[in-house]
Swiss-Prot record:
Enzyme Commission designation: 4.2.1.96
Family to which the UniProt record says this protein belongs: Belongs to the pterin-4-alpha-carbinolamine dehydratase family.
CDD domains: PCD_DCoH_subfamily_b
Naturally occurring in which organism (per UniProt): Dinoroseobacter shibae (strain DSM 16493 / NCIMB 14021 / DFL 12)
Catalytic activity: (4aS,6R)-4a-hydroxy-L-erythro-5,6,7,8-tetrahydrobiopterin = (6R)-L-erythro-6,7-dihydrobiopterin + H2O
Enzyme class: lyase
Domain of life, source organism: Bacteria
Protein name: Putative pterin-4-alpha-carbinolamine dehydratase
A single GO molecular function term of this UniProt record: 4-alpha-hydroxytetrahydrobiopterin dehydratase activity
Keyword Lyase in annotation: yes
Keywords annotated in UniProt: Lyase
The keyword Phosphoprotein is annotated on this UniProt entry: no
An annotated GO BP: tetrahydrobiopterin biosynthetic process
Amino acid sequence: MAQKLDDSTRDEHLAPLMRAGWEMVEGRDAIKKTFVFGDFTEAFAFMTGTALWAEKWDHHPEWSNVYKTVEVTLTTHDVGGLSELDIKLASKMDNLA
């Protein structure tokens, strides 16, 4: 089972994601990012690729898609905040984008 990020490693894990455009969600222990692609097909391909990893890791994003834009929020509901699963999925999403 995932564990909530502890204070000693939290900044270390989040810093690279913040530099890559992820932001903290106000009022929640969660991160968010907006991905913009060339068109709907590219956005949907990104979501499909992400979905395969999310299923493999049993960790699913909160997300929405409008045309070429995908808005993503990551948190681990089971632990009530951010976990290493969120860091792992955010990094994978950046690589897929």
